[in-house]
């Protein structure tokens, strides 16, 4: 097997250390929906204090492996915005574009243990049979050239306990698919990269939007596959917050041209994000500094106040 190039964190201390992360893609600037996710993950990390009196760590990962979708200058702009909003990260920001050899090593080990295979099925072919991949290529022994790589899905994990949404049950048929971990265009699939980097960064908690509930099931399966084969790891706890949507039912996203948040006047958006997250007992913070708002929010953060909903209309 290949030696894995894993950039692991420092040796664990005796007391548990919370390690959360925010992982934006540089396909555009941060919008209000992005701020909600970043703020929730930041507060959940910083409100945690272990037996040694240490706050949780909050890490940044720039998911820049899909180069065709990357907007020039967006990575730097994202970091600038986070700082303007008082969301200061720990350690060095990780760029997925630097992790290629690590991903290749994981793919190589999966192949050696016959836990993956090449597939030439197209999206239209899969859609024609109901939209769920049926493992058609699992025993075909295709070569890598021009084909995607799929994981041999031995577990099909489809339910989990969420930090905010309680018990979540995902689409069982979808969770049992042999899902793609390396695309036919040569790009590493999101599921592979995100799990690999959560392992490398020692992530213990993942807080993000409810649009990623279904992918969580696949990531749980990949964690278990790796842990039971060649890469011992601890699966993070997951928490999913509601999505911010418009009156037309559209999610605030870069694809839907959501407007960027204003670095020059962060306070109103910060307060609006706290209200969105259910942190209702907010004093008059309009005239407070960004640092004062953030410190207040850390001190008063309560997970159980986050709405148990998939989406919330903000109009």
Curated annotation (Swiss-Prot):
Its EC number is 6.1.1.-. The keyword ATP-binding applies. It is an enzyme of class 6 (ligase). SUPFAM superfamilies: Nucleotidylyl transferase. One of its GO terms (biological process) is tRNA modification. Keywords: Aminoacyl-tRNA synthetase, ATP-binding, Ligase, Metal-binding, Nucleotide-binding, Zinc. A motif ('HIGH' region) lies at residues 24-34. Binds 1 zinc ion per subunit. It comes from the Bacteria. Zn(2+) binds at residues 119, 121, 133, 137. One of its GO terms (cellular component) is cytosol. L-glutamate binds at residues 21-25, 63, 190, 208. ATP binds at residue 254. The keyword Nucleotide-binding applies. Its cofactor is Zn(2+). A motif ('KMSKS' region) lies at residues 251-255. GO terms for molecular function: ATP binding; glutamate-tRNA ligase activity; zinc ion binding. Belongs to the class-I aminoacyl-tRNA synthetase family. GluQ subfamily. HAMAP family: Glu_Q_tRNA_synth (MF_01428). Catalyzes the tRNA-independent activation of glutamate in presence of ATP and the subsequent transfer of glutamate onto a tRNA(Asp). Glutamate is transferred on the 2-amino-5-(4,5-dihydroxy-2-cyclopenten-1-yl) moiety of the queuosine in the wobble position of the QUC anticodon. This is Glutamyl-Q tRNA(Asp) synthetase.
